[in-house]
Design a protein with these regions (language model features):
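Extracytoplasmic
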Residues: 59, 95-158, 200-204, 485-551, ...
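Juxtamembrane segments of multi-pass membrane proteins
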Residues: 56, 73, 386, 390-517
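Juxtamembrane extramembrane loops of integral membrane proteins
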Residues: 44-104, 108, 460-468
């Protein structure tokens, strides 16, 4: 069958090929610029910056942080059979002393408060009895995480300005702990808990992810391309094009101010995979011989024939990722725009640089070098009648699995809950890493979910006695719930001070006692800088209440926050002094809840926009809405069926897997576009069987090879240390394989059904 072409496009591509040396030179210069830009991209994998800065909660949290600045909080768990034994306390005292000498580190434990109450005393058997009584005479130490059944806690505050400074500080802390961490001392284990260690691990692994997986994918790619085309020259043209495209695409981040995040590894990988698929389509068509008079004309005609489907398919993928710009999750938004921009660069390179390299390297045609897949024509001959015979089972099975996948994602009322959502920082850390295990150990007993309640009052009234009394009632109400571990605020300072001086941590409830307590708090704030952390000392216009608990015990996402807000409203209604105050939930914990609640809207909104734009764009190209819907079956089948796999495999929606809809739709639509484009070519014969045979012969082989490349590329992520990236690799690879199966079963079956329906309508009309 002759290749249909546009004479003007043939003339254009002829000039492109003739300018091959100039084109290669220009892209070489852009390659150097891209490499420079890629090296300038900053790292920003922190979870607390996932929400865009313009978000109201993010703005409020930023204002709160400016008013109540504090360093990074961390905790050392010194585990021992008896944490209050003489040896344990002596070792803890030594550790606290050495940590206090490290720059930017403030350390305190229950011994800090004991020395404040009793002065500096040598720890001996008699003194240990008094320390034990002091430590166990209140619940304050256990609530603060400074004492557990089998551990002694040392709280740390790191006042560091940069990640590099933080890493140096953590290294200094580790050098202090190393001699005691081998089990030779009184402690059976020393656990490190807190965001400094988690953030350091994430930054290290995020930065290494791209460098680790891109070479691995490159090995897969080179092996597959060589096996498919069996030509070093074809391999060279494809590899050089990919290297230039990826370098320029990554370098765009420096131009637009984007940064490396926990999911930015997907940008070069997605650009490389999509570009590779397009290059496979282009080279497969180039290798097919025709009746052209010379190689230059043949090359230009092949490019012209594939220009429309390749442009449409790359547009589909770019739109899919560009639709992520609607997300309120900043890394997702940036990743979508970054990938879409990279795909535009890739499209230009596919129709300029790649043809230039094909010409310069004189890549062989199929008559000169046999490619893999000699068995494929026989498969096509068997598939065409099989898809006609089993058209209804193929399409019906696909629709049934799609319904099951939708149920797995959105849930079934009364029977099945929706697919779970996760943004807890621990879900981004390898569970086998020591830092994750240490943090989970503390989380199970003390909880790590923190909500900051910013209570705003009339300026100058933050220390009014009645207001403080109302805040203490609110604190007691929260602490009466066993799911709440600790509540710290201005009145907790009074409780600590009262316990140190009198041995009782209970504050009086009588109104006439609070004027003196308010005066005492003012005096404490004058002498103790730590006490100022809970009051706006500049304007006395607000106070801060920090609430820590286990959010998982409250149920669905955001339930702990709603409980705190409802408790505040109840106490506020009962306390006249609180009625003029306004409370706002802020902080990293609240931002985490916001992110979680926006994951599903990000998935549905971006997917809906992607699907709508793709449908409208290709309706303009192919002019057949019913056929266009039919050709989307494999993509929709792959996306929804993969949610069923996620449900069965226990994989939750997170910052990476939430992208599966747009990623798979944009990537797999490439196959359906090429298939349907060549199906229309074959329809000129008037036979559905011949049209399907032509589409499978021309597009089927590159669809198969492109899917193998796509799935192997994303499967490389399965070796990642970052759980979300590993899960995304497994899920996306599964989706590509599912789409491939549907391409050769459900899609032809749907086209058979559509063609028979059209013939029936024409028969009735005649």
């Amino acid at each position: 069958m002759s290749v249909p072409v546009s004479p003007k496009m043939v003339q254009f591509f002829t000039r492109v090929i003739q300018a091959r040396v100039w084109i290669a030179g220009c892209f070489l210069a852009l390659f150097a610029v891209g490499i420079y830009g890629a090296l300038q991209v900053r790292d920003d994998p922190a979870i607390d910056r996932l929400v865009v800065a313009a978000d109201p909660v993010a703005r409020a949290t930023a204002d709160f942080d400016r008013l109540y600045p504090e360093g990074d909080q961390a905790l050392l768990m010194l585990e021992a059979p008896d944490p209050l034994s003489l040896r344990s306390l002596q070792a803890a005292q030594q550790i606290e002393s050495e940590l206090g000498r490290i720059p930017h580190v403030e350390a305190h434990s229950l011994l800090t408060l004991y020395r404040r109450a009793n002065g500096e005393r040598e720890l001996d058997a008699a003194e240990i009895a008094r320390v034990r009584a002091f430590a166990t005479g209140t619940t304050l130490f256990r609530r603060a995480g400074l004492l557990g059944e089998h551990y002694l806690g040392v709280a740390l505050e790191l006042r560091v300005a940069t990640p590099a400074e933080r890493d140096r500080t953590l290294a200094a802390i580790d050098s202090v702990l190393r001699p005691l961490g081998s089990g030779a001392g009184p402690f059976t284990a020393i656990r490190r808990v807190g965001s400094p260690w988690l953030d350091a691990w994430l930054e290290q692994r995020t930065g290494a992810a791209t460098a680790r997986f891109m070479p691995l994918f490159g090995i897969f790619l080179m092996a597959l391309v060589f096996i498919v085309y069996r030509s070093w020259r074809a391999l060279g043209a494809i590899i050089v094009t990919l290297a230039v495209v990826v370098a320029i695409a990554v370098g765009l981040a420096d131009l637009f101010g984007w940064s490396h995040t926990v999911i930015s590894t997907l940008v070069p990988l997605t650009v490389m995979v999509t570009t590779t698929a397009t290059l496979v389509y282009l080279h497969a068509r180039y290798m097919e011989p025709d009746d052209c008079a010379n190689p230059l004309e043949h090359h230009a005609r092949a490019l012209t024939n594939k220009f429309l489907p390749c442009t449409a398919s790359m547009f589909a993928t770019a739109v899919g990722f560009g639709a992520l710009a609607v997300s309120d999750i900043q890394p997702v938004r940036e990743m979508g725009l970054w990938t879409a921009s990279g795909l535009i660069v890739a499209w230009v390179a596919c129709f300029t640089l790649f043809p230039a390299l094909q010409s310069l390297l004189r890549t062989p045609l199929r008559t000169e070098r046999a490619a893999a897949g000699k068995w494929f024509p026989g498969l096509v001959q068997a598939l065409v009648p099989a898809t006609r015979r089993y058209r209804w089972p193929f399409v019906g099975a696909a629709l049934a699995l799609m319904l099951c996948g939708a149920g797995a994602l959105f849930g079934i009322p009364g029977l099945l809950t929706p697919l779970s959502l996760q943004t807890d920082v621990l879900t981004y850390v390898n569970p086998h890493e020591r830092v994750a295990q240490d943090t989970r150990t503390f989380q199970q007993s003390n909880g790590l979910d923190v909500i900051e309640l910013w209570v705003q009052t009339t300026p100058g009234h933050a220390l009014d006695p009645e207001l403080l009394r109302g805040l203490e009632r609110f604190t007691h109400q929260l602490e009466s719930d066993p799911r709440i571990t600790a509540v710290d605020g201005p009145t907790s300072t009074l409780r600590w001070e009262r316990y140190v001086q009198s041995g009782s941590d209970r504050l009086p409830s009588a109104p006439d006692a609070w004027p003196k307590l308010a005066a005492d708090l003012e005096q404490i704030m004058l002498t103790e800088p730590a006490a100022r952390a809970y009051v706006d000392v500049g304007n006395l216009a607000s106070v801060r209440i920090s609430i820590r608990g286990r959010a998982d015990l409250f149920g669905r996402t955001g339930a702990m926050r709603r409980y705190v807000e409802q408790t505040w409203l109840a106490v506020q209604a009962a306390e006249p002094a609180l009625r003029s105050a306004h409370a706002l939930a802020v902080g990293r914990g609240v931002l985490g809840t916001e992110i979680t609640e926006r994951l599903l809207p990000t998935l549905t909104e971006s997917f809906a926009i992607t699907a709508s734009l793709i449908f409208l764009a290709f309706l303009l190209v192919f002019r057949d809405p019913s056929a266009r819907l039919m050709t989307m079956i494999p993509s929709l089948f792959a996306i929804l069926a993969v949610f069923l796999i996620m449900r069965l495999g226990g994989i939750a929606l997170n910052i990476a897997t939430i992208l599966i809809g747009s990623t798979v739709l944009g990537a797999t639509e490439n196959d359906q576009i090429h298939f349907f484009y060549h199906f229309q070519e074959g329809s000129a014969s008037g036979s559905t069987a011949e049209a399907l045979r032509h589409a499978m012969q021309v597009a089927g082989r590159p669809i198969l090879f492109a899917t193998l490349i796509n799935s192997s590329g994303f499967l490389a992520l399965a070796l990642s240390d970052l759980p979300p990236m590993r899960q995304f690799g497994i899920v996306s690879s599964s989706a590509f394989i599912l789409a491939l199966l549907a391409d050769f079963t459900a899609l032809p079956g749907a086209l058979w059904i559509l063609s028979r329906g059209k013939r029936r309508v024409l028969t009735e009309a005649s």
